């Protein structure tokens, strides 16, 4: 049986003699043309610590592909550092990079007729970008997460990158000394690897274990550790076996497996960005999935992991406590996962979890049993109302009472909001409205970690609301509501809010509304005019033209 069903289109037959000539230049031998061609989509980059440790993983995958009697073909994918671009115009490129990465992988895999692809990535958008490509092309593939960073430490306190963002607010509020401010800055990121809490990178990589597209335990390993290198090699070996078994992404990515992934996200307290990304992944896999499905699962699945940003621990702690397999086994025993879903190994999820204990160890408090859940329901709530007729996403963990009604403080760019926060012009009870930051208006839905962290640092996390048609970082917590749709740029009602309007955020009732009459909104709408596009050329303009609404994943195809 031939295992090069795709690559034979480019290597076999008399007419492909020139093609083989080029392969000979790369060191191929005649017998290699009967072997599968396996792409290694290598996201290595020295732009960011999230991706700076990926080359070792790519090298291990290359060696494992060769040892499995297949041909590795290495190509690069770009990355944007969300942490570094945060609060700047560069953040507008973050979500766009998801689409660019997906397009890069699709282009290489399809253009070169690859028989399979090992995708290796680190920073936030690397994960959904890679998975969108695998789902879109349906070429056999596996995702290798670059691994988490190790926690930093200053004066005995563990740190993550969010510690540094929050320190900005604390320092400007006079609640932190200059010594401690600089100490946090210098020690927040002590190694290579992606940001350490259950932020977007760890959320998406963890969910890929539940989805069935990554190996068990791989998402919580630290990038510098040898086990991460070994896992990359094993992932490549497993992919070659999947090629031989003809297991394709769409055999794995189904409505039921996406339900598993979302249940895992709820149980671990994951990032709001997962909503946007799983809408896009489902779209690419041609799986029926809507924003309302997240709310359906939220009501069934409790939060059982005590993880940052709204909890205490980081990914390395989760790994020591049993990792994602332990969380999944608890959910499976509670009837909250579909155990019959296929995984990349060819085994079902239930079979993969057979060796995992039914309950977490008693000597840790990172993973809790169901009966001791931190929250009875999931934390990512879908709010609707006259400010979000298509829906908006709220993260409701970490708050004593996720309800507020207060005056709108309206900003049309992040910098103005940040200046107001740092100048103590935002008061308890206010509701910040940041708009014209959606998929088309931003464009690119930039993340708002800097202002939300400054609010936390100022001690206002429980008392100030924050809504936007942009996004929030996975490191954000507080009374925040993002992904408001329809967005302001297309005339969503968020565009009609005026300074001082009464706004209600009620996560219990799942309501997001501006408390003015329908007649007044209609009058304002008649006066509203769409702003001139911020960009007319280049990738930002292209994304603005193509992107769908956030409630459908901000996809471009």
UniProtKB/Swiss-Prot annotation:
GO molecular function, one term: magnesium ion binding
Residues forming the catalytic site: 473 (proton acceptor)
Record: residues binding Mg(2+): 82, 124-125, 447
Keyword Phosphoprotein among UniProt keywords: no
Gene3D superfamilies: IlvD/EDD C-terminal domain-like
InterPro entries listed in its UniProt record: DHAD_IlvD/Edd, Dihydro-acid_dehy_C, DihydroxyA_deHydtase, DiOHA_6PGluconate_deHydtase_CS, ILV_EDD_C, ILV_EDD_N, IlvD/EDD_N
Binding-site residues for [2Fe-2S] cluster, renumbered to this chain: 50, 123, 195
Family matches, as PROSITE patterns: ILVD_EDD_1 (PS00886), ILVD_EDD_2 (PS00887)
Pathway entry: Amino-acid biosynthesis; L-isoleucine biosynthesis; L-isoleucine from 2-oxobutanoate: step 3/4; Amino-acid biosynthesis; L-valine biosynthesis; L-valine from pyruvate: step 3/4
Enzymatic reactions: (2R)-2,3-dihydroxy-3-methylbutanoate = 3-methyl-2-oxobutanoate + H2O; (2R,3R)-2,3-dihydroxy-3-methylpentanoate = (S)-3-methyl-2-oxopentanoate + H2O
A Gene Ontology biological process term: isoleucine biosynthetic process
Keywords: 2Fe-2S, Amino-acid biosynthesis, Branched-chain amino acid biosynthesis, Iron, Iron-sulfur, Lyase, Magnesium, Metal-binding
Cofactor(s) listed: [2Fe-2S] cluster; Mg(2+)
Domain of life: Bacteria
E.C. number(s) listed in UniProt: 4.2.1.9
Entry-annotated residues carrying N6-carboxylysine: 125
Cofactor comment text: Binds 1 [2Fe-2S] cluster per subunit. This cluster acts as a Lewis acid cofactor.
Subunit structure: Homodimer.
Family: Belongs to the IlvD/Edd family.
Function: Functions in the biosynthesis of branched-chain amino acids. Catalyzes the dehydration of (2R,3R)-2,3-dihydroxy-3-methylpentanoate (2,3-dihydroxy-3-methylvalerate) into 2-oxo-3-methylpentanoate (2-oxo-3-methylvalerate) and of (2R)-2,3-dihydroxy-3-methylbutanoate (2,3-dihydroxyisovalerate) into 2-oxo-3-methylbutanoate (2-oxoisovalerate), the penultimate precursor to L-isoleucine and L-valine, respectively.
Database matches in PANTHER family: DIHYDROXY-ACID DEHYDRATASE DAD, DIHYDROXY-ACID DEHYDRATASE, MITOCHONDRIAL
Protein name: Dihydroxy-acid dehydratase 1
